[in-house]
Design a protein with these regions (language model features):
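Soluble catalytic domains of enzymes that build or remodel membrane lipids, polysaccharides, and related
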Residues: 130-368
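N-terminal signal-anchor transmembrane helix
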Residues: 82-140, 146-164
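Context-gated lysine
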Residues: 6, 39, 83-87, 128, ...
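Non-catalytic terminal accessory segments
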Residues: 1-115
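Serine/threonine-rich low-complexity intrinsically disordered regions
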Residues: 2-3, 35, 56, 83-94, ...
C-alpha cells in the first residue's frame, strides 16, 4: 500500500501530465491546435496509456519511461544551445520525432541485449600456495527466472557453461523470485543441476529467492530448498566449505534477509579457526560487505544483485549514490582482496537490459 500511495500513483500522475503536454506539443508542430475538449481527450488518452503500461509492466512501459527522460534531457540541450540551429532543433524536439527515435533505438537494443548471453572472463593471480593449474570458477546470478529466459534458452546457456570444464559453478542468488511460478522454479533448478563441473554447483541465496511475509511467491522456502538439493546443487549458507585443502568457499547468508532464523554470522565468525594460508573465496549476493570480508581474509569476493544498473539512466543513479561497494566488473578492493560483480544472466521486472550485458562469468585463479 505504501508503494501504491507514495510512489506508484504520484509517479503515474506526473508521467500522464508529461505525456499529455508531449502529445499537444507534437501536434502544434504540425499546425494543429486543440480545442479545450481536445486537450481533455488527449489527457484521457495519455492516462489510459500510462495505466496500461503501469499494469502490464512490459516493453511498452520501458519505452514510455525512456521517452519521458529523453524528452526532458533534449529539452535541456535545446535550452543550452538555443542560439544555434534553434529553428531546426525546435522542430525535431517539438515534434517528438527525435525523442521517439532515440527511445525506440535504446529500448530495442536493451531487448536484444537481454537475450544475447555473453561469457565474461577474468584472470586473478594469487600469492597463495595453490596448485599449478589453478582453479576455474563460473559465477551466475540474477536470472529471476520467468521474467525473460525460457527453458530452452537457459539450457543452452548451461550447456555452454558445462563445455567450459570448470572446477565449480556458483549460483550467487536471485535465480528465482516472486514472479517465478512453482513449475518454472522446478524446471530452472533441474536445468542448473545438469551443469557438469569438477566439484559441483553451489548455491548462495539472494534477496528475491525466498518468500517473506506479504510476498507473492508461489512456492515456500522449504519447497525451494528441496528442489535445489534434489537436483544435486549444494546450498552454502553462512558456512565454510572446503573445495580442496587449499581452496575454501565461504558462502554468506544474504545481508538483511529477515526470514533467516538467526542473524547471519559476521565474516570474522565464519572464518574463525580457518587457515589464512588457504585461498578464501567469498560468495555473497549483495556486494555491500567488502570491508568486512577483506578484513576476514577474503582473497576473492563474488557477487551479483546490482544487474550492472540494468537500465539507463538507473545505472547512472546507482553509480552516483554508490549504495554498493562495486556496481559491476572487477575491482581491487585492497592489495589482497579482489571483488567481482556480475550483471547477471538475465534481468528483473522487465526483459530490457541496456546498461550492462547478460552474462555468466568465468574466473581463472592462478598462482603468481
Amino acid at each position: 500500500m505504501f508503494y501504491l500511495q507514495k510512489i506508484l500513483l504520484p509517479g503515474a500522475i506526473l508521467v500522464t501530465l508529461y505525456v499529455t503536454f508531449f502529445a499537444m506539443r507534437a501536434l502544434r508542430q504540425f499546425g494543429l491546435t486543440l480545442p479545450t475538449w481536445g486537450k481533455w481527450l488527449t489527457g484521457l488518452g495519455a492516462a489510459v496509456v500510462v495505466a496500461l503500461c503501469t499494469v502490464n509492466r512490459g516493453v511498452g512501459t520501458i519505452l514510455l519511461l525512456h521517452l519521458v527522460v529523453l524528452d526532458a534531457l533534449l529539452r535541456l540541450v535545446g535550452l543550452l544551445f538555443r542560439k544555434k540551429g534553434a529553428k531546426v532543433w525546435g522542430r525535431l524536439w517539438g515534434s517528438g520525432a527525435l525523442t521517439l527515435l532515440l527511445a525506440t533505438v535504446i529500448v530495442l537494443f536493451g531487448y536484444v541485449n537481454m537475450y544475447t548471453i555473453r561469457q565474461t572472463d577474468y584472470t586473478l593471480y594469487t600469492d597463495k600456495d595453490i596448485r599449478e593449474e589453478g582453479y576455474r570458477v563460473v559465477l551466475v546470478a540474477d536470472v529471476h527466472y520467468g521474467v525473460s529466459l525460457r527453458d530452452e534458452q537457459l539450457q543452452a546457456a548451461c550447456d555452454r557453461i558445462s563445455a567450459e570444464n570448470t572446477d565449480m559453478v556458483i549460483l550467487c542468488g536471485d535465480i528465482v523470485d516472486e514472479n517465478t511460478t512453482k513449475e518454472q522454479m522446478e524446471a530452472c533448478f533441474r536445468i542448473f543441476g545438469s551443469i557438469q563441473s569438477r566439484y559441483g554447483v553451489f548455491y548462495i541465496y539472494g534477496n528475491h529467492d525466498r518468500s517473506l511475509p506479504g510476498s507473492t511467491h508461489s512456492f515456500t522456502p522449504e519447497e525451494l530448498e528441496e528442489n535445489i538439493i534434489s537436483n544435486g546443487i549444494t546450498i552454502v549458507r553462512d558456512e565454510v566449505l572446503p573445495i580442496t585443502e587449499e581452496f575454501l568457499l565461504v558462502g554468506r547468508e544474504d545481508e538483511g534477509y529477515s526470514g533467516f532464523p538467526n542473524d547471519r554470522l559476521s565474516a570474522a565468525e565464519l572464518v574463525e579457526g580457518v587457515s589464512q594460508e588457504s585461498f578464501l573465496l567469498f560468495a555473497e549476493h549483495k556486494p555491500v560487505s567488502y570491508g568486512e570480508n577483506a578484513a576476514a581474509g577474503a582473497d576473492l569476493i563474488l557477487s551479483g544483485h546490482t544487474h550492472g544498473g540494468q537500465m539507463w539512466p538507473i545505472n547512472l543513479f546507482m553509480a552516483i549514490t554508490a549504495t554498493n561497494d562495486n556496481l559491476y566488473g572487477s575491482m581491487a578492493y585492497t592489495d589482497a582482496t579482489t571483488g567481482i560483480v556480475t550483471s547477471g544472466l538475465a534481468c528483473w521486472g522487465f526483459d530490457v537490459k541496456n546498461a550492462a550485458p547478460s552474462e555468466y562469468v568465468v574466473v581463472t585463479i592462478l598462482p603468481e
